[in-house]
């Protein structure tokens, strides 16, 4: 039986019911709906709608239902209820009779679903937060193990300057830390309770909404009933955080896919996160990483879809807002899955240090060192840049690295070049010189690793 049937003399068309019903996806709010109902029953006692004995009877039934839902949540889908609120009420009436019909007094599905969704977001947000921390920890540990693994850094996918694998790891730690911060900000802003806002104008019962919010674990009650049931900006914020986070994971995956390729050969992925080919027996494909990269698009789509859904809605609640859940559920599930898979992909990853060092020595990644040397000798940088470009062309013509060119040839490009240039062109020197904060110098990378481990230890 629908919760709104008294106004209607005709039954809903079967096709409309299938189109309108949301239980097939909002069943995921069952725990939150029951928890919200327990808190609402307490509020109804304070205004005399329920006696203490009635409330205790309701709580006993709701608690038993909660345990059943936690054991087998998908059993809810066997029902033909319109939505999760209808299902919970039907279950309650089946257990306590007409007393169950009193629970919805003073409450609307509008403030009920807004509350359920915020509670779900808080629960899911904490799981995401832990997954973000776990990935940062694994990256930091990987960085500590590979501080001396020199490899080429890239711009335009061309070798640019030497870095270390540790420095690469710590770059993604920084991105993930910002993802964590964005998530925390979104969770902080959504931490207000809409319950007691009614359909749009507030409840007619003198309920202490701040106390009700506290019972539910919110920091405060919302301040405007119309806003409380009308907006889903907290959904947009979480989707935005997920979209940005997935962009970072997609880039992380792309880097590792390239590093793992035969053309680069910098790393070897574990067989636990790779698969083979049905035709080519030699293949070891980075499927886990490719799926992370591929799933990024669906999260961006969820954000775009929700923006379009909300942009033209008048206040207050509209049925369009039922569309807030499927995209959100899928996006946050996807983000969580990809964070966990990225963490797994790093487990067993082997860095091929000789190959990394060989690649770092190729491609004239030390050309900037020669330019800096010339600047130190008093040559303006733009002129030094031009001189080094000519030297690189000459080295290319001979098929030699810069450090293999004889001093006489280097001096033909600039007489200020002396024999003291050769130690500066070595890979280790290239790294050590980048000693400003955040640079690739070993002491800077070691400091970044220590700082990250200290920060991550403090937030757990």
From Swiss-Prot:
Its EC number(s): 4.3.2.1
Domain of life of the native organism: Bacteria
GO CC aspect terms: cytosol
UniProtKB keywords: Amino-acid biosynthesis, Arginine biosynthesis, Cytoplasm, Lyase
Known catalytic reactions: 2-(N(omega)-L-arginino)succinate = fumarate + L-arginine
GO molecular-function terms, A-Z: argininosuccinate lyase activity
A Gene Ontology BP annotation from the UniProt entry: arginine biosynthetic process via ornithine
Localization per record: Cytoplasm
Pathway involvement of the protein, from the record: Amino-acid biosynthesis; L-arginine biosynthesis; L-arginine from L-ornithine and carbamoyl phosphate: step 3/3
Top enzyme category: lyase
InterPro entries: Arg_succ_lyase_C, Argininosuccinate_lyase, Fumarase/histidase_N, Fumarate_lyase_CS, Fumarate_lyase_fam, Fumarate_lyase_N, L-Aspartase-like
Family statement: Belongs to the lyase 1 family. Argininosuccinate lyase subfamily.
HAMAP family: Arg_succ_lyase (MF_00006)
Name recorded for this polypeptide: Argininosuccinate lyase
Name of the gene encoding the protein in the UniProt record: argH
